[in-house]
């Protein structure tokens, strides 16, 4: 009788331990799932994301998606403004787009390199926000930082999924995470997009988020040197591109993207035109 009672107690202890472990796993999964971000967008400089895919982000936020932007540099080498003014402007743009968060990795503007140090900074962001989709700079562009940033982010997305690469943030070990998709937005060069997103209802918000960078665009009172994006008609050309991509895809305005791999559709329901 005593032996039977002891066996029962032992089994109950094992059961309690199993239940506790299952509960802990459930809690951890719940925590990680609530920390997940739908879209993590990277830009070599503050304003890259707004110019390249601001309309897409505004649209996704309106649909209830969580979007976070990470700027690689402070844009300190920009012809106009300072890193401090651009920091304030980036915060204003984030409010306009409705971002869940915005961070800056403080990499060296003009000298982006695909180094282990820079890769690991990005890996930590990917593991922190755990996005399904990453948006990154154009794969080829006028500014060398853009293509370098695109490759840097792409490599970091792969490395972030390797279990033997360990990272720690705020004293806690991070879980591995690899995004499902990496899409590159268009910038200065007219790269042929592989797909477009309809931003017809969000062009105004895209333009507003760009204009938050007051020091970077047309200002008739400015005494600072001119740049390719400070001309009076720059936003007209930005609007024209969106309009032209929209014309080609059967909508009013659109933003174009390239993909690092072939995109698979479940069906034709999501096709606009």
Regions found by a protein language model. Give the residues of each.
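A ubiquitous, low-specificity "background" feature that marks scattered single residues
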Residues: 12-20, 27, 54-56, 77, ...
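Active-site rim/loop-helix segments in enzyme catalytic domains that contact anionic ligands
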Residues: 27-129, 258, 270-271
